[in-house]
Regions:
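The substrate-binding groove and active-site-proximal loops of carbohydrate-active enzymes
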Residues: 13-21, 81-98, 128-144, 202-218, ...
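Structural detector of well-ordered beta-strand residues that form the stable sheet scaffold
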Residues: 161-163
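Residue-level detector of conserved catalytic or cofactor/ligand-binding positions
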Residues: 226-238
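Aromatic-lined substrate-binding rim segments of carbohydrate-active enzymes
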Residues: 107, 121-159
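Alpha-helical packing segments of well-folded alpha/beta enzyme cores
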Residues: 38, 98-105, 109-110, 145, ...
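Aromatic- and acidic-residue-enriched segments that line the glycan-binding/catalytic groove
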Residues: 48, 52-68, 125-141, 166-204
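N-terminal structural segment of carbohydrate-active enzymes
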Residues: 2-124
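Formylglycine-dependent
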Residues: 3-9, 80, 173-225
Length: 238
């Protein structure tokens, strides 16, 4: 992906569009019919963290010394400096993943839409991406999870959504820098743990340190996952 060209395209679309980068403007955007009218949807929270099968914040908490996750990790996998969260990726094989069977089950349950987590706070993308090699198409299962589900959802007449939790990656692995672990400086854009900033007690719009322009630009570019739907439908829930 040509990052600069894609950013220019985003700016051009924004300039020509009816919405502006303000809460007042964005609040006028109507809720999509598929989300407003459908009675039941299935939300899927699944990823590399499913390998240790502890919970979805395992990647953060295993780097907090004294936490139950840290103790569990050391007991079962060793010290984080020797076996970090990224080392679970080769074990995320998804041998039994059958998107057709999944969608059939969801449809039989009465669901009309499916919303998987396309990227969790841990930074691993469950879709093919040109922005990072840390994605399911290139590592782990070597499958485009979102793309595979999209094909089957469209075939069944269902809408597929995408939930992106990338913004919290800013600090999600930051505790790993507090002791000798596999998360250490220097880190750069494209590295798995980057930027691993210190976590503050209050995560709000005014928390310091604020995300850098480099991080926010990368976050914006990752919303390009909306294009995996072309020419079909993908509902974006970020």
């Amino acid at each position: 992906m040509n990052r600069e060209r894609y950013l220019q395209e985003i700016d051009a679309v924004n300039a020509a569009g009816k919405y502006h980068p303000t809460w007042e403007s964005l609040s006028t955007h109507p809720v999509p019919d598929w989300y407003r009218e459908k009675r039941l949807g299935i939300f899927l929270h699944w990823g590399v963290f499913s390998v240790p099968a502890y919970h979805d914040w395992y990647a953060r908490n295993m780097y907090i010394k004294g936490s139950p996750e840290y103790e569990y990790h050391c007991q079962h996998y060793g010290q984080p400096k020797d076996f970090g969260f990224k080392d679970f990726i080769p074990q995320f094989k998804m041998e039994a993943f059958d998107p057709q069977a999944w969608v059939k089950l969801f449809r039989e349950a009465g669901a009309d839409y499916i919303v998987p987590v396309a990227e969790h706070h841990d930074g691993f993308q469950n879709y093919r991406s040109e922005l990072s090699h840390w994605n399911a198409a290139e590592m782990g299962p070597h499958r485009d999870i979102m793309g595979d589900l999209l094909v089957e959802a469209e075939r069944a007449g269902m809408t597929l959504g995408a939930s992106s939790h990338r913004v919290e990656h800013w600090w999600f692995l930051g505790h790993g820098q507090e002791f000798d672990s596999d998360i250490k400086q220097p880190m750069h854009l494209g590295d798995y743990a980057w930027p691993a900033m210190p976590e503050r007690e209050n995560q709000d719009l005014f928390s310091e340190p604020m995300p850098t322009d480099e991080f926010l630009t990368d976050w914006l570019l990752r919303l390009s996952l909306i294009h995996i739907s072309e020419p079909t439908r993908l509902g974006m829930i970020s």
